[in-house]
């Protein structure tokens, strides 16, 4: 099957979403009323149920992305991807590209190279920036810019940028296929958090008894009873002890918070100590009340919430993307040449933000090196070991690198 041309559906920018999960990224984009998801890919069977419950009109492709031909994906304006975070996160044991799930980025890149969307959007765990001494993100960054994308990235916390009481830091990568929109785009500014825990957690309701911790029900109940004593805070059972989150927000939700009694957020309520309900964990990610949770085991719903995104942060970034597309939507993508090397400019702003793009393409390393002498002597040419040292020391620097294609 060949591409379906569906640019600008009903004057809205179209989206193809990969590793779609339960649809948090497209939900945030669609809340702006400027975007419409027309294709999504998700292989997890339980996530598929939740996705289709809430997005019945979207063509959900349930195959493994490795089985999807790039030519089968509709031609869209934006390709989004939140490839499995376990391959990069501390919680996923720091496996990185040694884990086969890390290879899924290259499957996403395969689709991007074929479809050439105007915008790419990636969300992942904060640790992706520093994983493997910085090499993991270096590969991702260089792969995107070598294929003609001008990218900016920044680590944002949901409580600071989404007005959501959850401590959730994630890296957001936005890429454009032309420099004009890239230059105009900025990440949103921080906002005051006015949403309180009581807005997402019902401390007065009587929930199903299965959510409560009772004497004789859990072998560690005495530790919980002693530690969990205050309203308006969230605790976390950490296998052997209780950790109190004193910042007035929910600790970072994880995919395993519903299994094994570990990483479970706990609250002190009118009716006793209990864990958050699945609905409350989705609330903590900024999902609206009308978002439907299907009849699935709670363990699946907890996993889906823990793997998902902070919807209001996605929406705020999407608003800025929409703004630059409306003002600078020009079709002058970089001409990707049949060359062997790319001369790449990077502005590394510590480990938490930056931007990068390809200056030009060359047939040999020597040509790229000679070109740098002609175009810019302010910023040095650095090599992999020097880059790793910058990441290790969390330093900021503007520099060039030569990437073999």
Model-derived features with residue positions:
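Short, mixed-charge low-complexity intrinsically disordered segments
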Residues: 373-405
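Class I S-adenosyl-L-methionine
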Residues: 30, 48-52, 68-76, 86-252, ...
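Short acidic, glycine/proline-rich loop/turn micro-motifs
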Residues: 90-94, 264-267, 298, 355-356
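C-terminal target-recognition/interaction regions appended to catalytic cores
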Residues: 216-333
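Short aromatic-glycine-(Arg/Gly/Cys) micro-motifs in beta-strand/loop hairpins
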Residues: 335-357
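Core alpha/beta nucleotide-donor-binding catalytic domains of modification enzymes
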Residues: 2-119, 126-130, 135-138
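A short, exposed loop/beta-hairpin motif centered on an aromatic-Gly-Thr core
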Residues: 352-369
């Amino acid at each position: 099957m060949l591409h379906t041309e569906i640019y600008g559906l009903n004057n809205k920018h179209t989206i193809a979403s990969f590793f779609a999960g339960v649809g948090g990224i497209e939900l945030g984009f669609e809340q702006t009323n400027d975007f419409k998801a027309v294709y999504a890919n998700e292989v997890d069977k339980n996530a598929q149920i939740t996705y289709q419950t809430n997005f019945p009109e979207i063509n959900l492709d349930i195959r493994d992305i490795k089985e999807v031909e790039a030519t089968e994906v509709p031609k869209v304006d934006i390709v989004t991807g939140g490839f499995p975070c376990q391959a990069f996160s501390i919680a996923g044991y720091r496996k990185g590209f040694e884990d086969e799930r890390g290879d899924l980025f290259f499957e996403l890149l395969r689709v991007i190279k074929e479809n050439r969307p105007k915008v790419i959007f990636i969300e992942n765990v904060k640790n992706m920036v520093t994983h493997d001494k910085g090499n993991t993100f270096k590969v991702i960054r260089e792969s995107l810019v070598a294929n003609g994308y001008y990218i900016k990235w920044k680590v944002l916390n949901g409580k600071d940028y989404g007005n959501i009481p959850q401590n959730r830091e994630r890296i957001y990568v936005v890429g454009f296929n032309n420099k004009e929109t890239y230059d105009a785009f900025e990440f949103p500014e921080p906002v005051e958090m006015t949403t309180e825990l009581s807005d997402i957690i019902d401390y007065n309701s009587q929930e199903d008894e299965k959510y409560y911790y009772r004497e004789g029900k859990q072998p560690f109940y005495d530790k919980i009873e002693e530690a969990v004593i205050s309203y308006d805070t969230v605790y976390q059972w950490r296998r052997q002890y209780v950790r109190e989150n004193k910042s007035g927000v929910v600790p970072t939700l994880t995919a395993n918070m519903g299994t094994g009694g570990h990483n479970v957020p706990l609250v002190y309520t009118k009716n006793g100590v209990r864990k958050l309900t699945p609905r409350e964990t989705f609330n903590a990610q900024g999902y609206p009340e009308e978002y439907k949770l299907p009849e699935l085991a709670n363990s699946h719903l907890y996993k889906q919430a823990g793997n998902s995104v902070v919807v209001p942060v996605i929406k705020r970034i999407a608003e800025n993307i929409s703004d630059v597309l409306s003002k600078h939507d020009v079709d002058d993508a970089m001409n990707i040449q049949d060359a062997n090397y790319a001369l790449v400019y990077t502005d590394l702003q510590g480990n938490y933000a930056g931007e990068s793009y390809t200056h030009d393409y060359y047939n040999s390393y020597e040509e790229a090196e000679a070109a740098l002498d002609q175009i810019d002597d302010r910023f040095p040419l650095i090599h992999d070991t020097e880059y790793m040292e910058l990441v290790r020391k969390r330093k900021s620097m503007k520099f060039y690198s030569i990437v073999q294609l």
